[in-house]
A protein has these predicted regions:
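Beta-strand secondary-structure signal
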Residues: 23, 70-72, 82-84, 109-113, ...
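Periplasmic polypeptide-binding modules associated with outer-membrane biogenesis and secretion
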Residues: 15-33, 46-293, 316-334, 368-371, ...
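Bacterial N-terminal signal peptides
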Residues: 1-9
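Conserved active-site loop/cleft motifs that coordinate metal ions or position small ligands
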Residues: 541-544, 577-583
Length: 605
């Protein structure tokens, strides 16, 4: 009696049903894409190693896979296809298909047997408009359909074609275009699918005056004015709306900007647009480290106040110390600047950039102590093009070996920039080009000269996935009509070092004095070719060949090129690559190193 009570008080644990080891094989295997699609949807395959189950669970998995795999066949255009799943040779649809326990060393065979049949094709494509008088408009939009008779009858392709059709209508100025109905009829006799779309284009519309919400420190009137200049009264187009959104993001004070279109037109027949924004933290700090053999360590940092006055103005204080370690801290180079960027300057589509700074440079080519000030107006011509210009002033002392002379320079700078790349630190496709011209006037000796510099680079994504990139760069500089001695030391052209010709010491290429120090020149030629190869998710490499020359007069010297070559390693981060390059000079001169190491953030160009 006592024994029975103990059993009732402490019941024996329920025995777990034995798990079954199994292995899945998909047949036939002659269509790799189809097999991959099946493996992507099959729970039998996904849970094979990670989630053991018993016989009933395995049977449930197999039966649940039947509709999934059937849909996968249809998604690839096999509308008449069939699938059969067998466990140890038994069809899982049979009532007696429940599998028995198996030896883990001999897993049960699970066969997924496909009978895809022929792939169905697109038959007739019809588009009907509501109202009927818009048929001509649909015929025009159909040029962007991306679907034609005879194409595989894949649902994803049909939906993509539908989206392309609506986008074409929206680009034509119809913001409310919609699909009223889509009829897809499969004919199993002809193995085709006929598609009929009924489309309502809706009315043509212009943009209404945009509204903005979500600001906490930024004046919303500023943003509404910026958006209205680009949208209000303009014919509707998704691209125009996206450009306005990017213009707001370009202010640099928002973490995101979302453009929401109204579902209906206003009473005056225009489309209201509402922008929702979220501001970034008001303050930001950052820094950068770099290293170059025979130049030393470079460290820079900045502090930024975004939206300092409520008009999306940005004040940045930044400093840099360079040549740390090459000659000791006493001969290091120091730079400090304060920059204020003001968008919508004077209520126009201009950005003003006011900058003051001080530099103390100790270089092999010259020593300079100077104060600088500049005022620049920038205007974007498009998403890829911008122009800028304005006056600048420099005053200080410059010379060599302690023989310093006073100088005062007035200049007026003008710049054109083109850039259609998407990543400033790691460009993989596109082009960049800039040309700047600055005439200078020396107030102390009444000397006049000008400096012109053009730089271009192209990037080719050879494999289409960013894994293999060919990068090309060229630069041409000239001081038209001037000899080298008429140009102040810091405004002369120099070549050599990181960002120029790797393998050589900074500024070392070109004419030299009796002490073997660079004199600079009145013209510049540089060219680079670099192959960038991704090896793994986080690692890559580069092979490069750089060349450059500095001419004594304003005519570029193509005959005196000095070349350097080498290899590099890239550690790829979410922000940009960390770069380590080793360059070897091919035209060594006196005191040139046998190699040089460069470490920095971002690609070399």
């Amino acid at each position: 009696m006592l024994f029975a009570c103990l059993l009732l008080a402490n019941p024996l644990p329920a025995q777990e049903p034995p798990t079954i080891a199994y292995r899945v094989e998909v047949t036939p295997r002659d269509d790799d894409d189809l097999v991959s699609a099946i493996r992507a949807v099959s729970q039998l395959i996904k849970l094979e190693e990670t989630a053991p189950t018993d016989g009933y669970g395995l049977l449930a998995r197999a039966r649940a896979d039947l509709p999934r795999i059937t849909e996968a066949l249809r998604a690839d255009g096999f509308w008449g296809g069939a699938v059969r799943i067998e466990i140890a040779g038994r069809d899982v649809t049979r009532p007696d298909a429940s599998p028995q326990a198996s030896d883990p060393a001999n897993p049960l065979p699970v066969a997924v047997i496909l009978t895809p049949g022929p792939r169905y094709r697109i038959g007739q494509i019809l588009m009907r408009s509501e109202p009927v008088q818009e048929d001509a408009l649909l015929e025009q939009a159909a040029a962007d359909l991306r679907l034609a008779e005879g194409d595989p009858a894949r649902p994803a392709d049909i939906l993509a074609a539908e989206a392309a059709l609506l986008l074409a209508l929206r680009r034509a100025g119809y913001p409310l275009a919609s699909v009223v109905a889509r009829d897809a009829v499969v004919d199993h006799d002809t193995k085709t699918m006929d598609i009929t779309w009924r489309i309502a284009a809706g009315p043509l519309a212009d943009f209404a005056r945009p509204t903005v919400a979500g600001t906490t420190r930024t004046d919303p009137a500023l943003l509404e004015r910026l958006a209205a200049r680009r949208l209000e009264g303009q014919p509707y187009s998704p691209e125009r709306l996206e450009r306005a959104r990017r213009a707001m993001m370009g202010l640099g004070v928002f973490s995101f900007v979302r453009a929401n279109e109204a579902p209906a037109l206003s009473q005056d027949g225009r489309l209201p647009v509402h922008f929702q924004v979220q501001e970034r933290p008001r303050h930001a700090v950052g820094g950068r480290l770099g290293f170059e053999t025979n130049y030393g360590l470079t460290a820079s940092g900045y502090w930024e106040n975004r939206n300092i006055f409520g008009g999306a103005e940005r004040l940045r204080l930044e400093g840099e110390v360079a040549r740390i370690g090459e000659t000791g801290v006493d001969n290091a180079t120091y730079r400090a600047f304060a920059t204020l960027r003001t968008p919508e300057f004077l209520g126009r589509d201009l950005q003003s950039v006011s900058q003051i700074g001080a530099v103390r440079e100790r270089l092999r080519a010259y020593d300079r102590d100077a104060a600088l000030a500049s005022f620049t107006l920038e205007h974007r011509l498009s998403d890829t093009m911008a122009i800028s210009g304005g006056p600048n002033y420099e005053e200080g002392r410059i010379g060599r070996d302690g023989d310093m002379n006073d100088f005062r320079l007035f200049g007026v700078m003008g710049t054109f920039r083109y850039d259609n790349t998407t990543n400033p630190l790691d460009p993989r496709q596109g082009q960049r080009f800039s040309i700047s011209a600055t005439p200078y006037y020396s107030a102390l000796d009444s000397n006049k000269f000008a400096r012109v510099l053009a730089i271009g680079s192209s990037y080719f994504d050879v494999t289409g996935d960013g894994g293999s990139v060919l990068a090309l760069r060229a630069a041409l500089g000239s001081a038209p009509g001037a000899d080298r001695d008429e140009i102040t030391l810091d405004k002369r052209f120099y070549a050599g070092g990181g960002g120029s010709v790797r393998g050589y010491t900074y500024q070392s290429i070109g004419p030299r004095d009796k002490g073997n120090r660079p004199l600079g020149g009145a013209s510049l030629v540089e060219t680079s070719i670099e192959w960038r190869q991704r090896l793994t998710r986080n690692w890559g490499m580069a092979a490069f060949l750089d060349a450059g020359s500095v001419g004594e007069d304003s005519k570029p010297d193509f005959g005196g090129l000095h070349a350097g070559t080498g290899l590099g390693v890239r550690y790829l981060t979410a922000i940009g690559p960390i770069r380590l390059d080793v360059g070897v000079p091919l035209n060594r001169q006196k005191d040139d190193p046998s190699f040089a190491i460069y470490i920095g953030f971002g690609q070399a160009f």
